[in-house]
């Protein structure tokens, strides 16, 4: 009897969490949509807003946690590609639910030359359909959005592979220059 009760409770919790998570995916902006705005602190405590990137391409990548294996690889690949990305007229911002102190340590440890934005409550990740919300724990899904010079979503990369994400973005930007 207790086993069935526990199974029922567990099933209910799983369904509830699935429903909560499904809501954030419904917010996913598509190519051509205006990029959802944001006002977030970076690793240096400076407030960053979407509008400051008008006139350049913006690679906005969401990642689960600072200093975890996939996130380190993805960040280092963006770091190593900064010259090519800047030549293509692009800036890079990483966003996770970590605080700006964690971001500062992460950026310092790996010499990251771009902004890491602290989305502590996951609000911005939610507006980009990129939040995993399990109630007691939240983290960003590994999605990347390429925002054009006019502030519109140009390309969406979902569930990206950290080892390939940067190459896909660079290749896309090169096709625009050709």
Please state what every model-predicted region is:
Residues 2-178:
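Chalcogenol-based redox active-site neighborhoods
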């Amino acid at each position: 009897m207790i086993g069935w009760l526990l199974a029922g409770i567990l099933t209910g919790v799983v369904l509830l969490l699935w429903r909560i998570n499904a809501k954030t995916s419904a917010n996913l902006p598509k190519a051509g949509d205006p990029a959802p705005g944001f006002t977030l602190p970076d690793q240096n405590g400076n407030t960053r807003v979407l509008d400051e990137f008008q006139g350049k391409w913006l690679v906005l990548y969401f990642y689960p946690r600072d200093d975890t294996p996939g996130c380190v690889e993805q960040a280092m690949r963006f770091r190593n590609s900064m010259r090519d990305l800047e030549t293509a007229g692009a800036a890079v911002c990483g966003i996770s639910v970590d605080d700006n102190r964690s971001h500062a340590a992460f950026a310092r440890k790996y010499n990251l030359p771009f902004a890491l934005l602290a989305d502590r409550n996951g609000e911005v990740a939610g507006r980009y359909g990129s939040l995993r919300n399990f109630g007691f724990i939240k983290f960003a899904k590994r999605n990347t959005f390429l925002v054009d010079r006019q502030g519109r979503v140009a390309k969406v990369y979902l569930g990206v592979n950290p080892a390939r994400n940067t190459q896909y973005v660079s290749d896309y930007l090169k096709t625009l220059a050709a």
